[in-house]
Curated annotation (Swiss-Prot):
Species: Deinococcus deserti (strain DSM 17065 / CIP 109153 / LMG 22923 / VCD115)
BP term (GO), one: negative regulation of DNA-templated transcription
Positions of the ATP-cone domain: 49-136
Details of cofactor binding: Binds 1 zinc ion.
Zinc finger (unnamed): 3-34
Family: Belongs to the NrdR family.
Pfam name, any one: ATP-cone
Keyword Transferase on entry: no
Stated name of the protein: Transcriptional repressor NrdR
Record lineage: Bacteria, Thermotogati, Deinococcota, Deinococci, Deinococcales
Keywords: ATP-binding, DNA-binding, Metal-binding, Nucleotide-binding, Repressor, Transcription, Transcription regulation, Zinc, Zinc-finger
Biological role: Negatively regulates transcription of bacterial ribonucleotide reductase nrd genes and operons by binding to NrdR-boxes.
PROSITE patterns linked to this entry: ATP_CONE (PS51161)
Amino acid sequence: MKCPYCSAPDSKVVNSRPSDDGASIRRRRECLNCARRFTTYERAQLEPLMVVKRSGPREAFNPDKLLRGLTLATEKRPVDADALRAFAYGFEDDVQASEIHSEEIGKRAMTFLRPLDDVAYIRFASVYRDFDSLERFIEEIRGLKDQS
C-alpha cells in the first residue's frame, strides 16, 4: 500500500479488525520508509446497482445524488441529517436486485420522508412527480392531509 505521506510503495499492517459496521476491514499500517501510520479500509467489491433512467439510459447508483435530493427537500426542516445519510448510503444494500428504475428510487425516498416531515415529503414529491400545475400540487397536499 502506497504511503499517503511520502508515497513510498511499501507498508506493513500493524493492526487489523472489522470496522464498526462489519462491512469492511480496518487496517492500521506503518510506512517502511517514513514510519508514519495511516488507516485503510478494505471492502468487498460488488457489482454496482444500476439505475434505469426515465429516458432509457443506465447509470451506476450514486448515493450522493440521492442524498442531495433528500437534503434539498429537508432544507431548514427539523429532520436529522444522519437519518438522511443512513437512508442514502444504505439504499444500495437494501435493494435486492442489480437494476432499479429511477421511479422506484423516488417512491422509496417518498416513503422514507413521509413519516419524517410533511413539508419535506411535498417538496420531494413536487420534483419527483414533476407537478405541471398548481391543481396537481394541491391534490397531493389534500391526499397527504387525508392520510393524516
